[in-house]
């Protein structure tokens, strides 16, 4: 035979980790790993893998949007971006990479964990 045979054991496929999901989406390592965080009602939470999976599954993949926004950025004279319902901060992250910090105004969504990710990564404003 001229091909490689891979043995199948128990017919299982390993689930990707949140870190692997972050890397596939183009986020920095640990982007959604907040440790302990506080919601808008003051309740303290510990970051769970399920919250990370959900937030990453509802986010954008950064590489194609980085390409689009870098081309758009070349034609703009004012480099401030407003990002509504941004989830875990994909668009502000790209915009900050292209233009420096403080150039994106953001508003997150209604779910507590994505709001916490964005607030921790970009500050309250």
Regions found by a protein language model. Give the residues of each.
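C-terminal target-recognition/interaction regions appended to catalytic cores
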Residues: 1-86, 90
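Core alpha/beta nucleotide-donor-binding catalytic domains of modification enzymes
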Residues: 76-125
């Amino acid at each position: 035979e001229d091909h490689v045979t891979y043995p199948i054991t128990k017919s299982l496929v390993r689930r990707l980790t949140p870190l692997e999901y972050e890397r596939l989406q183009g986020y920095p390592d640990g982007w959604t790993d907040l440790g302990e965080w506080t919601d808008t009602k003051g309740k303290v939470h510990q970051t769970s893998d399920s919250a990370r999976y959900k937030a990453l599954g509802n986010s954008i993949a950064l590489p194609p949007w980085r390409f689009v926004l870098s081309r758009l950025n070349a034609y703009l004279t004012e480099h401030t971006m407003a990002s509504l319902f941004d989830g875990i901060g994909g668009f502000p992250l790209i915009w900050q990479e292209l233009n420096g910090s403080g150039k994106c105004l953001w508003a997150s969504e209604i779910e507590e964990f994505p709001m916490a990710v964005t607030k921790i990564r970009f500050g309250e404003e």
